[in-house]
Amino acid sequence: MKLSLENVNLNSNSGPNSFGQKLFKYMPSCGVTFENTPEPDAYLCFIESGRATHNAPLFQRLDGIYFNSSFDYTAQNSNIKRTYDMAKGVIFQSNFNKELTFKYFGPHSKYAIIHNGADLDLINSIEKIKIDKYENIWSCASSWRPHKRLKENIRYFLEHSGPNDGLIVAGNVEDKVKHERIHYVGELTTEKLFSLYKASRFFLHLAWLDHCPNVVVDALACGCQIICSSAGGTKEIAGENAIIIQEDDWDFSPIELYNPPPMDFARKHENIWNVNREYDMTSVSKKYYNFMKGTLNG
């Protein structure tokens, strides 16, 4: 299959683009070649297309839509929906993402839910960072926008960690909570993140209404126990031993995303939603290929 990627920057390490790098690495084992040719067998577009038409079937990888009531989410979604309506098939990153999109755009006739995957070859080649100062390392990593709830991550750590545990926060942070057991390391390369995850016992991701964060899949693949919110799609990929903080159900109505509610950590429980047990990119790539090939042949 000759596949042309659209709206993917293989030189960027943002969430969608880092996943694009993984597809580019692993899908050739399925018989896929990535070509910038005027006559591909199909296009795979991440999120939205800038083209009016395509000369081959279009597949959309959709990792989220806009619903923040503080912005004009209808305008923000306009081209995403246009791409959705053009697409022969749509790949959602989580059940949550599918239900959200169906609410705003309507059902799609051909879709698959394929959770994000981890580059196990790269992970297995990396040694964990040596940190002897603490009994247990906790970590978290994100682009720290308000709904990622860094301060809730920190509060959970301070309330549940042992006196000899340390928290390492990756990503740029402007409003830092100062504490002798909390360390801010800024933006890290993928390799350094994996090295940190491999040294961590716990990975905190208490983001509100997140779709299917790559950092959680990567941290799980590195051996971390995940602690996350029930709100959104993260719980689907957090693993069977994840700790879930229960939050109120959301009916998908527009909401102030950057004004998340405080969390009640007493509402924690085991993960009853975990549905993703094949998070290595070899399996994920095969799912992408099988969905696109089956749709083209159907």
Regions from the PLM with identified roles:
Residues G171-F194:
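Nucleotide-activated donor-binding/catalytic signature segment of Leloir-type glycosyltransferases, i.e.
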Residues F96, G117:
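Carbohydrate-associated surface elements
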Residues A42-S70:
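Active-site proximal beta-strand in glycosyltransferases
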Residues Y84, S195-S200:
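Short alpha-helical donor nucleotide-sugar binding micro-motif in glycosyltransferases
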Residues K130-K148, I154-E159, L167:
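Conserved donor-binding/catalytic core segment of Leloir-type glycosyltransferases
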Residues Q225-C228, K235:
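Short hydrophobic beta-strand element within catalytic cores of glycosyltransferases
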Residues W208:
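Aromatic "clamp/platform" in nucleotide-sugar-dependent glycosyltransferases that forms part
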